């Protein structure tokens, strides 16, 4: 279902979620951005995404849009979070969209998918691993909220 499997830290009601498709938890905590007119119940992510699913009439409707953005590796995690929040707020939340995001920075791996150190040797020590690809996964609702907190028609942008 539309990328929700990337965010396995919450459970949806059993509408179409498949826990067997989740990925290893290699990301930071999932963060939530809501417009000010969003119902208070949407602060609970499972309520939000179940509401998104229940708002659709068609069984094969697109429920969300996922965007992946690269982040400067020179920034700290806190700075990457702040930068991502500002981008989401100004670009999506300002027009009524609800968003979740998680920041990943997976280690560089060898051909057997084992993390490696700066000399190319397998390493399980996070202090020796190489991290070069910080990025954010942003999941957006397809429908913006109106001023009363009700779903509007889907956004075509």
For the regions a protein language model found, what residue spans apply to each?
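N-terminal nicking endonuclease/strand-transfer module with a His-rich metal-binding environment
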Residues: 1-157
């Amino acid at each position: 279902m539309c990328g929700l499997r990337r965010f396995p830290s919450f459970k949806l009601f059993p509408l179409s979620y498949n826990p067997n498709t989740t990925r290893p938890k290699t990301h930071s905590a999932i963060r939530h951005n809501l417009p000010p007119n969003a119902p208070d119940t949407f602060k609970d992510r499972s309520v939000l995404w179940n509401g998104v699913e229940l708002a659709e009439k068609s069984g094969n409707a697109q429920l969300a849009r996922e965007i992946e953005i690269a982040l400067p590796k020179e920034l700290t995690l806190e700075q990457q979070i702040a930068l991502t929040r500002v981008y989401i707020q100004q670009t999506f939340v300002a027009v009524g969209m609800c968003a979740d995001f998680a920041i990943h920075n997976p280690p560089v791996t060898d051909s057997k998918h084992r993390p490696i150190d700066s000399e190319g040797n397998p390493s399980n020590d996070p202090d020796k691993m190489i991290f070069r690809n910080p990025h954010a996964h942003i999941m957006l609702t397809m429908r913006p909220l109106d001023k009363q907190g009700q779903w509007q028609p889907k956004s075509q942008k």
